């Protein structure tokens, strides 16, 4: 028996849901002094930044850690680079974050539908 998948039209992330702007500086290299070098920043418009708070316990002390997931749509977000690189910097609300995970999400084709980027 052959399974026939129905065609799907997956809508893009809604523009009214993409309420934030970020600045992205792509990781370039480490120079000979072990300093990280970044590309010139680009402003990406119409993204969503969702924060989460976790408590980390190390020995006798504990601290709060703020992580975020950034949603970037392939159609509705503006000034989107072709790819995102781990170790790159994201600036949001005056604070710098480092990309630790890039998840390209595909809907029904080989082209990216949106990205989910985890930062710390």
Task: Label every PLM stretch briefly.
Residues 2-3, 26-120:
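Short, conserved turn/kink motifs that form compact alpha/beta structural patches or helix kinks used as
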Residues 1-22:
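N-terminal intrinsically disordered, low-complexity, charge/repeat-rich segments that act as generic
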